[in-house]
C-alpha cells in the first residue's frame, strides 16, 4: 500500500466505518467506527511522505517498531498506544492491512 486511496479503501471496507475530516484540513483524513465514532486510522502527509497512524496493542507495539524501520511511535498521539507507519513501500501490503485491522479491533 502506497497511496491514501488504497489505505482509505481498506479501512472503509471494515464493517460500519466512515471517513471523516475533523480538522477541516484535507491533509488529515480519518476512518472511524460508526457506533462509537472512535478513529482507528489516520492518514496524512508529513515531510513529503504519506503516513498513517494506527492504534496498537502495547504488547505488539515494539514488535512492529522493531520489524520495520517505517513503523515509529505515533505522531501527535499517545506513543504507548499508537504507531505511525510511513508508507514508503518497505512494508508488505498484508502487514499494513493486519495493523489496520488490529487497530479497528481495538476500538470496536
Locate predicted features:
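Charge-dense, helix-prone N-terminal extensions
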Residues: 1-108
